[in-house]
Amino acid sequence: MPNLSKVFEKYIYKKLAIYFENIFSKHQCGFRKGLNAQHCLIRLIEKWRECIDQGLEFGSLLTDLSKAFDCLPHDLLIAKLKAYGVDISALRLIYDYLTNRKQRTKIGNEYSRWRDILYGVPQGSILGPLLFNIFICDLFFITNDFEMANYADDTTPYVYGIDITSVIDSLEKAGDLVFDWFKNNQMKGNEGKCHIVLSTHENVHVNIGTSQIKNSHSEKLLGIKIDSDLNFEEHISSICKKASAKLNALARISPYIDEGKRRLIMNAFFNSQFNYCPLTWMFHSRKLNNKINRLHERCLRITYNDNLSTFEELLNKDNSVSIHNRNLRALAIELFKVYTKQGPDILQDVFPINNEARYNFRKKAHFTTRAIRTVRYGDNSLRHLGPKIWEQIPSDIKEAESVEVFKSRIKSWIPDNCPCRLCKTYIHNVGFI
């Protein structure tokens, strides 16, 4: 793309992004400032946990779109921009940006004829993802009877009800509405490639259009393996396996490289395995936590060529903390953003704030603690543990003037009395204390 076009593209992007920020659904998490895949997954998983904790059944439909960014029709996009109130001069500029593009195919030394590109947004452009978000914005207008998680072209409607029969019925209706929208908007939805994950282990089928889809025990969504029990054992075992393979490679080359290079490799290839959307799976079983800690300890021993120190001594040598404590700090940062109203609206639903301080100036606003019914889904949820962990953070850290200051201060914090099951002590006939 010519440099002059890039300047215009950035200018159009800035204006459109500001204009549409209040139009986009809070559930649209892709390609938006302050939102990411982790926020999308947190909202979905926490709603799932909340429903099961309340004795309800839950169901989700993982839809499939073929080449979504390449199939977007230009004329329909322009019509939608006009309907949203974009003025005529801006429409002409965007129309010129999209149209009069050509492509051809090369096979060996032979070329096809040039053909006009009538669909899709420019690949690798700044403006393309934003235009895609605008195009699918009205998809959320049909979600009166169900909710929907969305990140770019990954769209996952989900429902809940008093029994699995009502959930299947609602999910079929939601799926039909979503795929009708795809068809009416000239998007290529693949009903046969969809996946269903329900809160039941029963072998049931869901009819979406002309396809009959069998319930799956687990499926990958946005890079995270989600199972019907929400224990994330498959996902954590998978990333541990990948991390172990990286450690084997590091162990083989460690005699030939210095400590500084080993630390770089550790951060790039080991730590990165556990850095993707960790808040979705951080409160797992003690067994899985021990598995992660053993790998982490092995990694530090290889990095520092130290087979004598304890795990705690190795962490001190590395000036780091365990992966669980690192995740607690990451959660604290998200809580701070919500508390100071700098976080995305989608997390305000997960961590609601009690605003009684508005009427009683002696009290400070605090996160609402919700009643729970079960240990697995209630006590183990972010919505339950988040407010408790927030109370563990010292006031001088929580009163930071900005997110950057909070991030700097939280690096020194390790909870003294973390309420999660991983940090509690189990006593026979008593339970976790």
PLM features: what roles do these ranges have?
Residues 12, 64, 81, 94, ...:
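Short, conserved catalytic/metal-binding micro-motifs enriched in Asp/Glu and His
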Residues 56-59, 190-194, 257-268:
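Short amphipathic alpha-helical interface segments
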Residues 173, 187-219:
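Short, conserved micro-motifs composed of acidic
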Residues 1-5, 29-38, 51-53, 66-70, ...:
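Conserved, non-catalytic sequence blocks in retroelement Pol enzymes and Pol-derived host proteins
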Residues 1-122, 159:
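Conserved pre-catalytic core of RNA-dependent polymerases
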Residues 287-433:
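Short linear motifs embedded in intrinsically disordered, charge-biased segments
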